[in-house]
Design a protein with these regions (language model features):
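Active-site phosphate-binding strand-loop segment of PLP-dependent enzymes
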Residues: 112-176
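Short glycine-rich anion-binding loops that position phosphate/pyrophosphate groups of nucleotides
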Residues: 6, 67, 91, 136-139, ...
Length: 177
C-alpha cells in the first residue's frame, strides 16, 4: 500500500473550464508563483464555506499538485537531522520528501482500523521531532480519522511545539458504509 488512485473521471465542468482557458489564451503566460488571484480567492472561499475558518487569499499558495504542496511544507519546517512522524502504511512520498529536506522519517504503525492513534504519535515524539503527518481520508487506505482524534492531534502539536501536517487531498472522497 502506498498510493491512492481515483477511479472516476475529471468532472465535466472542470474539463470544460480547462478547454475554455486554453482556447481563450488564458494559459499562454506564467501566473504568479502563488497561483492566480481568482484561484486563491476561490480556495479561500471554499475553506470558509466547507472548513469553517477564514483564510486571506494572500496567504494561499496554489501548487501544481499535492506532492508539491507537501514538499514545500516539509522543506519549510524540517531541518537536517529532524524527525518527521509518518503513517505506516502511508503515501509513498512522505518518506522521500522527508529525506529531501534532510530529515529522518519515523514510521508510526496504524491501528487495526487503519487510522493513526494519537497516543502512538505522542509516544513517538522526541526532542528531534519537527513534524508529524496525518492524512484523512488516508492515502492509500481510505480510513477516516475521527473528530476526537483530529482534536487530539491538534493538542499534541500545540503541547509539543511540533507541526501537524494535515494532508487532506481526499477530503471530499468519502464513502458511507
Amino acid at each position: 500500500l502506498g498510493l491512492g488512485q481515483p477511479d472516476f473521471p475529471t468532472p465535466e465542468h472542470a474539463r470544460t473550464a480547462a478547454v475554455e482557458a486554453i482556447e481563450s489564451g488564458a494559459t499562454d503566460a506564467y501566473t504568479s508563483n502563488k497561483g492566480t488571484v481568482e484561484l486563491r480567492e476561490a480556495i479561500a472561499e471554499k475553506t470558509a464555506r466547507d472548513n469553517g475558518y477564514d483564510v486571506d487569499p494572500e496567504h494561499v499558495i496554489a501548487t501544481a499538485g499535492g506532492s508539491e504542496a507537501l514538499h514545500i511544507a516539509i522543506e519549510a519546517h524540517v531541518d537536517a537531522g529532524q524527525e518527521v512522524l509518518i503513517p505506516d502504511p502511508g503515501f509513498v512520498s512522505y518518506e522521500a520528501l522527508t529525506h529531501l529536506a534532510g530529515g529522518t522519517p519515523v514510521p508510526v504503525d496504524l491501528r487495526e482500523d487503519l487510522t493513526m492513534d494519537p497516543a502512538d504519535v505522542e509516544a513517538a515524539i522526541t526532542d528531534d521531532t519537527a513534524m508529524f503527518v496525518v492524512c484523512s481520508p488516508a492515502n492509500p487506505t481510505g480510513a477516516v480519522q475521527s473528530e476526537a482524534d483530529m482534536r487530539e492531534f491538534a493538542r499534541i502539536a500545540d503541547e509539543h511545539d511540533v507541526v501537524c501536517l494535515s494532508d487532506e487531498v481526499y477530503e471530499r472522497i468519502v464513502f458511507e458504509g
